[in-house]
Amino acid sequence: MNPKNFAKAGLVAALVVAANASVAGPDNMVVAVQQLPVIVEPQGINNNALDRVAYSIYETLIRADLKTGEFFPGLAESWKRVSPESVEFKLRKGVKFHDGTDFTADDVVFTFGQERFMAKDAPGRAAAVEFLGGLKSVEKIDDYTVRVTMQQADPLIERRFAARMSEIISKDGWMKAGGWDNWIKNPIGTGPYRITSFKVGNRLALERFDGYWGDKAPAAKLTFVEVPELSSRVAGLRSGEFDLITEVPPDQIKPLSKDGKIDVVGGAIDNIYALVFDAKSNPVMANPKLRQGIMHAIDRDLLVQALFAGKTTPANSFQSKTFGEMYLPEFETKKFDLQKARELIKASGYKGEQIVWRIQPAYYTLEMTVSQAVASMLKQAGLNIRLDVKENWTQVEAAGKDRMINNASFSAYFPDPASQLWRRMKPGSFWEAEGYFPASDEYKRICELGKELDSSVDPVRRKAVWGEMLKLFDANPYAVPLYSLPMIYAKQKNVVWEPGTQGSLDLSARGLSFK
């Protein structure tokens, strides 16, 4: 799509909100996002757009604080380990789904069952397998007790069932809908807000769920509206049409902060912005030396200082300091070395063939600007780069010989390496299933080690395994990290809200209030 058309689309969306919404505030909170998800079923897709809205609609058995990662009871009142492979959950009584039906163990079993997830061709499996591929069974012990069992010992069961893809849905709602195709038109959760309408590419309208078991939602109505153009989001915020806007670039922080009615919040989150390579579809990308050359050609420090005013940090490896003892600082040494990049590219046998890099104009903060800057760096290293602007993820990730590089983010959905690089690269993950990764000795070994990372309960061994995985990935990179993804927001001053370390927005009574 022509960038001018994106601007028009953003203006139209803003006008639609202005025409249909009352004054922004606790009666009708409006959040302007750069892109809405194409589906609001929690296992429908894995991306930042769905992360942003799912937290308001659905709940997991365990809740993890979005700022600290600390556990607190969700749909389960308590839980205990019964073996290295199993956790037993005692479910909360008196919880209602948005359609008024009772939440019981049957809903938990169905959520992870054959029809939705466990079967090989189940509709939720493609997105959720990266998170829950090791699940063996979810058994009903009684109406308010379930036992989750993994295929092998797993030190992270509790983390997995507090993260995305583990949100509980209504079995009764699914059955009445007659299956996935109708269900996704009006999915039902237990969260503080319920869906009233959803139009892809336009708006997602929610309302306070009066039957919610916990503290009532602070906003009577909550609307997410798609406004791709930054200037339209900013204009809507200044005029009072929007309460909160996403994807604010650093150069807008000072101008917006000078507005006495607006606050700017946020910063780097536990998510690494990166380039992903299809090393299989086109022989140009097959040689690991060429991909290593790309890794060393990018000046991450310059990107962070010049484009993000130091509001984020460079990433030289796929790690987060929230990993604690599993964080390996020795892998964070600077990768930028232009001479080394040129030598590796020459050694790869590269002959100047065009390398296509598919991007979207503004899915990520400054996506176009960053892509142009990095493309310039890669050209200095001797690569013939062509940026190919696409409208959506379907076009970006469509199979073909011109699928060579695309932008992506690597969220750490919980503070452990298993939640980030390995989750996105393991067998059965989206990119592996879509044919991005060719067979190689390094990838085979990474997969062997990844299984051990998922199953070992020995912290010392897990740390050693993770270090070996990072070494192998540097030797044959299928992606290269750039920086921690910044998530900067601007909001009305009467909105009391702070973002966490994830892309999810907590707009419940725990996270939101109004002055």
Predicted features along the sequence, with ranges:
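N-terminal lobe/hinge region of extracytoplasmic solute-binding protein
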Residues: 32-83, 113, 186-192
